[in-house]
Amino acid sequence: MPYQYPALTPEQKKELSDIAHRIVAPGKGILAADESTGSIAKRLQSIGTENTEENRRFYRQLLLTADDRVNPCIGGVILFHETLYQKADDGRPFPQVIKSKGGVVGIKVDKGVVPLAGTNGETTTQGLDGLSERCAQYKKDGADFAKWRCVLKIGEHTPSALAIMENANVLARYASICQQNGIVPIVEPEILPDGDHDLKRCQYVTEKVLAAVYKALSDHHIYLEGTLLKPNMVTPGHACTQKFSHEEIAMATVTALRRTVPPAVTGITFLSGGQSEEEASINLNAINKCPLLKPWALTFSYGRALQASALKAWGGKKENLKAAQEEYVKRALANSLACQGKYTPSGQAGAAASESLFVSNHAY
C-alpha cells in the first residue's frame, strides 16, 4: 500500500473538528432552513402566501430572530444560497444574526437529484462541478459547514448496488472538497420512508447504505472527526400496516449506527423524514435513552419538524410574528431536551405538532 499523502494539515483538522463540535454541543442541534425556492413555494402555498423573495426573507427572519431561549438549542442553521445573502430588517446579514446567537452558519451546496439511467427510478445528486470555488466563496461569506443530500428508495429491487455505490462516491467527493476549503461536510444519505417495508428491512438497508458511505469516505481520505452524518431514523415504511414502538425504532436505529458509523464521527444529526413534530421529538428522545453504548452526539437537523407549527401560526401575516416565533421556540426547546434524553411529551402539543409531515417522494 503506497504512503498516504496527508490531505489536511493539523491546523485544518483542528478547525474542522472544532466547528463540528460547536454544532453538536450538548443540547444543540441544527435548524434546516435550506429549502430550495421550489420547496419553500409549497410551504408558503400551504398557508395561502405568495412565494416572493420578500416573503421568503421575512419567514426566514422570523426563525432566525426568535428570542434568546433558542440560543442553547440551535448549534447551526443550514441556509439556501439566496438566504445566505439576505439581511434582517435591522440591516444585519443573516449569517451575522446566526453567529450573534452562538450558531454556526451552514449552506446547502448540492444542485438536486437527477435520474440514474438503467435503474428503477433511482437517482444520484449533482453539483460537484465548481464546488471547490463555491465552497471557498461561502467560507469567505461566513459559512463553516455544508450539506449535500443523496436519496435512496426501498423497493423490491432497490436500492440497487449501483445506486448505493454512486451515491456513496458522490458524498465522498463532496466531503473531500468541503474539507479542503475549511468547511465541515454534513453527509446525508437519506433513505426515503416511502413504501410498505417493515422496521427490519429499513434497518438492513440503512446498514448496507451506511457501510458503503463510510467505505467511500475512507477511500477518499476524509477526516471523520471533521464531519457530521445526517441519516434517516430506522422506521417502518409509511404504508406498513404493522406498528412499532418508539423504543423499537430507537433500538433499530442505534443498532444500525453502531454497526456502521465509526466512533470518530463527531455527531449524528437526524433528519425528520416527514414525521410529525411531536413524533420526531419523541423518537429522538428514545434514541438518546436507548441502553446501548453511543459514542457520538445524537441530535437533530430538522426542517419541517421545527417549522410546521410556526409556519401555520404565521399564516403569512406580519401581525402573527410573535405567535409564530413562540411555536418555533417550543419545538427548539423540545428537541434540545430530546437530544439529551430528557424530553417528556406534555400532551399539550397542538394539532399542527401532531400532524404527519410526510410528502411522497420528497424532493428538497
From Swiss-Prot:
Localisation: Cytoplasm, Myofibril, Sarcomere, I band; Cytoplasm, Myofibril, Sarcomere, M line
Quaternary structure, from the entry: Homotetramer. Interacts with SNX9 and WAS. Interacts with FBP2; the interaction blocks FBP2 inhibition by physiological concentrations of AMP and reduces inhibition by Ca(2+).
Location of N6-malonyllysine modifications: K111, K312
Gene for this chain: ALDOA
Modified residues (Phosphothreonine): T9
Disease per record: Glycogen storage disease 12: A metabolic disorder associated with increased hepatic glycogen and hemolytic anemia. It may lead to myopathy with exercise intolerance and rhabdomyolysis.
Top-level EC class: lyase
Protein name: Fructose-bisphosphate aldolase A
Positions of modified residues (N6-(2-hydroxyisobutyryl)lysine): K99, K147
InterPro entries cross-referenced by the UniProt entry: Aldolase_I_AS, Aldolase_TIM, FBA_I
This protein's GO CC annotations: actin cytoskeleton; cytosol; extracellular exosome; extracellular region; extracellular space; ficolin-1-rich granule lumen; I band; M band
Organism (species): Homo sapiens (Human)
